[in-house]
């Protein structure tokens, strides 16, 4: 019994040593020559920039600027029906959502940490370079930030959405 334990322990030790010393290649590929163009839009800033004066036309402009995300955000995530808004009730609802105390607190807390995305943009650019390295034929997705949605998701084949409020950290009051 003792001899079989020694053999098993020796085998495990040999396996670990083999794993540790067998990998001599660098841990990450060289992406210094990889070029990508990063498109980053701030949906949360555009949404919360709505003003009471003529918010109906401002919401129309948002729908034009975010043709894939806008219906996905409000229909799929929010559960609103965008199909028949001839009365403007949906736009009134969106305005009330933006003005609600919860939405305002969420937006304000997010802006305290993420008003400037310069460092995040650098990390994202590096990630997209790795993406291009491993998938050279794939389309680099447009990146859109927002709040009050799942942490990260794709909408369509070329849109990557990141919900910044999900990354506020453990000290966030929200």
What is each model feature region?
Residues 24-96:
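N-terminal mature-domain "stem" immediately C-terminal to a signal peptide or N-terminal signal-anchor/transmembrane
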């Amino acid at each position: 019994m003792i001899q079989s334990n020694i053999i098993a322990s020796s085998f495990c030790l040999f396996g670990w040593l083999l794993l540790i010393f067998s990998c001599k290649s660098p841990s990450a590929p060289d992406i210094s020559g990889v070029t990508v163009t990063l498109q980053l839009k701030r949906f949360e800033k555009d949404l919360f920039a709505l003003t009471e004066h003529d918010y109906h036309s401002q919401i129309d402009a948002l729908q034009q600027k975010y043709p894939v995300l806008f219906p996905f955000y409000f229909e799929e995530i929010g559960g609103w029906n965008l199909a028949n808004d001839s009365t403007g009730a949906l736009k009134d609802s969106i305005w009330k959502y933006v003005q609600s105390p919860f939405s305002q607190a969420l937006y304000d807390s997010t802006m305290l940490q993420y008003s400037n995305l310069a460092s995040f943009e650098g990390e994202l650019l590096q990630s997209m370079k790795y993406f291009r390295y491993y998938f050279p034929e794939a389309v680099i997705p447009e990146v859109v930030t927002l709040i009050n949605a799942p942490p990260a998701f794709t909408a369509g084949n070329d849109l990557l959405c990141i919900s910044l409020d999900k990354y506020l950290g453990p000290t966030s009051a929200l």
